[in-house]
């Protein structure tokens, strides 16, 4: 993982309700981490990659950064997409105890990082 991303993520973690995260370049996964024992790490990483890829296809933002969310029965996937094509995907439990303000801070902070 690049030092700037590693330092950035370390400054925000842990976040209540965060089950997994992934940082993805347009053609490669930089890091994928499953933070709960209730999910399989390989399946979780694959799902996050697919959500990011579908988001890139459906919501191509070009020169602008974007944030989007896919909602499932038990989880939500929040994605921050930077103008350089790097994305941060957060798999968050779908319950009222999640620290959503913290999740939003991470997403916006990732978009605002000067370099990845």
Task: List each language-model region with its residue ranges.
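Non-catalytic interaction/Regulatory regions outside core domains
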Residues: 1-25, 30-116
């Amino acid at each position: 993982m690049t030092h700037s991303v590693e330092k950035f993520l370390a400054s925000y973690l842990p976040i209540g309700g965060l089950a997994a995260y992934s940082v993805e370049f347009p053609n490669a996964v930089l890091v994928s981490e499953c933070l709960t024992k209730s999910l399989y790490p390989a399946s979780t990483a694959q799902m996050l990659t697919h959500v990011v890829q579908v988001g890139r296809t459906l919501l191509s933002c070009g020169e602008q950064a974007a944030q989007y969310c896919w909602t499932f029965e038990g989880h939500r996937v929040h994605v921050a997409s930077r103008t350089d094509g790097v994305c941060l995907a957060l798999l968050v439990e779908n319950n009222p105890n999640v620290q959503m303000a913290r999740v939003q801070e991470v997403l916006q902070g990732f978009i605002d990082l000067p370099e990845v």
